[in-house]
């Protein structure tokens, strides 16, 4: 019975774990969020974004970045993350 578990169940569970880690890594990509913060700043500086919208978006993105960094720190304990 244990041999069958080793042959059929364990590879499936490993694959699910790898897919979950990859999905979380993409979902919480800090470089993408940082790029959005830079884009928001640039649009504000060239006058394409009003100050109130800039501040609102900046706060949203900074909150997303904090969350993403926390999640990535937790993931780092599980598996090495390549940047």
Swiss-Prot record:
Signal peptide: none annotated. Keywords: Gas vesicle, Plasmid. NCBIfam families: gas_vesic_GvpG (NF045779). Proteins GvpF to GvpM might be involved in nucleating gas vesicle formation. A minor component of the gas vesicle. Gas vesicles are hollow, gas filled proteinaceous nanostructures found in several microbial planktonic microorganisms. They allow positioning of halobacteria at the optimal depth for growth in the poorly aerated, shallow brine pools of their habitat. Expression of 2 c-vac DNA fragments containing 2 divergently transcribed regions (gvpE-gvpF-gvpG-gvpH-gvpI-gvpJ-gvpK-gvpL-gvpM and gvpA-gvpC-gvpN-gvpO) allows H.volcanii to produce gas vesicles. GvpF to GvpM interact with each other in vitro, and may form multi-subunit complex(es). Encoded in a 14-gene locus called c-vac which produces cylindrical gas vesicles only in the stationary growth phase. This is Gas vesicle protein G2. It comes from Halobacterium salinarum (strain ATCC 700922 / JCM 11081 / NRC-1).
């Amino acid at each position: 019975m244990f041999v069958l578990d080793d042959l059929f169940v364990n590879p499936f569970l490993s694959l699910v774990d790898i897919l979950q880690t990859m999905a979380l890594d993409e979902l919480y990509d800090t470089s993408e969020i940082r790029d959005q913060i830079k884009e928001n700043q640039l649009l504000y500086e060239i006058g394409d974004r009003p100050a109130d919208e800039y501040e609102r978006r900046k706060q949203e993105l900074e909150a997303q970045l904090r969350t993403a960094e926390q999640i990535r720190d937790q993931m780092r304990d599980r598996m090495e993350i390549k940047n």
